[in-house]
Amino acid sequence: MNNYMNKKTTALLVSFLISCTLNAQSYISIHDKAIVVDTHNDILTTCFEKKYSFDQDLKGKTHSDLNRMRAGGIDVQVFSIWCDGLQQNPYAYANRQIDTLYAWVARNPSAMMMVKKPSELIQAVKQHKLAAMMGMEGGHMIENDINKLDSLYNRGVRYMTLTWNNSNPWATSAMEETTDSLLHQPKGLSEFGKRIIRRMNELGMIVDLSHVGEQTFWDVL
């Protein structure tokens, strides 16, 4: 009886292990066939501020670098451009981060490609290069100037988070809508904010509502 039970247990264990192996193979197959896109990674700002090189081994310093992204099967990386609301000259600060990303791509032409449109993305994937895109986390970086929005779009920024934790003159953030920091100031989008949304729609730029206040959310819709 014990011998029978041992054989049965062994058979079940083997079946389980085979199933796990097949599932793992299925996962790898699906991952390899898919275009894997990470739409937000703060590595650009981290490297810019700490003077790290993304194309070097950053284990122990950051959660990702170029080699780890490629090993992990990331096909498209949207690099986040960020600064807090206290940063002086945030538009220039954003552009320096963009310059950093362009420098990475220039140093690694066989591994990375800057993409601004779908056809370029597909080209990068077919060439087994990391397709580099950009998103901007905080509308304060356009400094209340639609022309600066256009300029950032032309450089490759394809989404803008309307606010970070700080509000700006044309949109209020979730943090400030839910605290007393706004006092009696209006919440949501201003008329200029609505112009910003219309311009983003004209450009085909994604309107990211992360971090925005509830009134801003409804005003955008």
PLM regions with names:
Residues 144-154, 176-221:
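Histidine/acidic residue-rich metal-binding segments in metalloenzymes
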Residues 17-18, 50, 218:
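Alpha-helical transmembrane segments and their juxtamembrane interfaces
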Residues 6-10, 42, 46, 212:
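A generic signature of intrinsically disordered, low-complexity regions enriched in glycine/proline
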Residues 7-8, 158, 199:
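Basic side chains
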Residues 1-29:
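Bacterial Sec-dependent N-terminal signal peptides
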Residues 25-183, 221:
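N-terminal hydrophobic targeting/anchoring segments and the immediately downstream early-domain regions
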